[in-house]
Regions:
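C-terminal terminal-subdomain/extension
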Residues: 42-93
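Compact nucleic-acid interaction/catalytic patches
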Residues: 1-42
Length: 93
C-alpha cells in the first residue's frame, strides 16, 4: 500500500465525505525535482525518506485509507506543500 499525505480539510472528513484529497509519496527519490516533488524526511512510522508527488494530487475513496498516521508534517512543511500545489495548479495566492 502506498503512503499518502492527506491535504483535504478536516471539515469534509468530519462530514463523512466519501473521498479524500491526497498526494502520494514514493521512496524513489529524485533530486532537484521541485515543484513536482517535495522531500519528506523519515520520521515516526515513515521508515524512509520519501518524495511527495505533487503532480499526482487526486481524490481516493476513503475505503482505501488505513487507520492511523504514519507521520505528521510540521506546519511549515504543510504550508510548503500547499504553496507548491498552488504553484503547480497556477492558483494565485
Amino acid at each position: 500500500m502506498r503512503p499518502v499525505l492527506i491535504v483535504q480539510g478536516q471539515a469534509l472528513l468530519d462530514a463523512g465525505h466519501p473521498s479524500t484529497l491526497i498526494v502520494p509519496l514514493t521512496t524513489n527519490l529524485m533530486n532537484d525535482a521541485e515543484p513536482l516533488r517535495l522531500r519528506v524526511a523519515a520520521r515516526e512510522r515513515l521508515d524512509r525518506d520519501s518524495d511527495l508527488l505533487i503532480d499526482q494530487l487526486r481524490a481516493i475513496d476513503n475505503r482505501r485509507l488505513s487507520p492511523g498516521a504514519l507521520a505528521r508534517l510540521s506546519g511549515d512543511e504543510m504550508r510548503a506543500v500547499y504553496r507548491t500545489i498552488a504553484e503547480v495548479l497556477e492558483i494565485s495566492e
